[in-house]
Amino acid sequence: MRRREFLTLSTASLGGVLLYSLDRKPFRLFAQTAQSIRIPLRFFTQPEALIVAAAASRIFPSDETGPGAQEAGVAIYIDRQLAGPWGRDRYRYTREPFAENAPAEFGYQGRATPRQVYREGLKDLKGFDQLSSVEQDNKLRQIEGTPFFSLLRRNTVEGMFCDPIHGGNADMVGWQLIGYPGPRMSNYADVDKHFGEAFRPKPVSLREMPGGDKFRPGEDEE
């Protein structure tokens, strides 16, 4: 697994994300803050990670209603997915014939692996993270009909609302945004304790479930 490059993220944005100590000097994914944590990249190069983070933040921006892709660490989620079996197309039937103009509900039907789609697509977004928000939106509209944008948009939503065990939804900000309590085993105790009250339980991750510490998604990375 490649650990030569890594991101620096704000602890305020990504509460609960594991700190990795590496020898190389970190670079900033977002503006410098008082505290930061370093997260190794497993697939993206540093420039690619900056572009993906900026693009995801335009697809799912934070606003007055709550956090967005930046706070959820979506770029880390996508990096982990591409580094794992999904990025290498382990889960998809990849032999011919390939459908032309397939309906959107069929999902991605191309020959290239997700890794290849991202690598090629990111070439067209060189310098994207240096553009203004208006310029970024215009650039994304230009590629809106491409397989790359379809994957990026899908992965951004996944990274917002996945279980944090997969690298996104940091501190369960996505679940808190929509009021999802997570994969709870039972609500009996809360029903008895808060009977007759308006109650929204704090979300819990798979990692907090019995045996959750043994779950290691994506460990067959190259």
Q: PLM features: what roles do these ranges have?
A:
Residues 36-37, 47-54, 65-222:
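Mature-region segments of soluble proteins
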Residues 8-9, 29, 33, 141, ...:
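Intrinsically disordered, low-complexity segments enriched in polar/charged small residues
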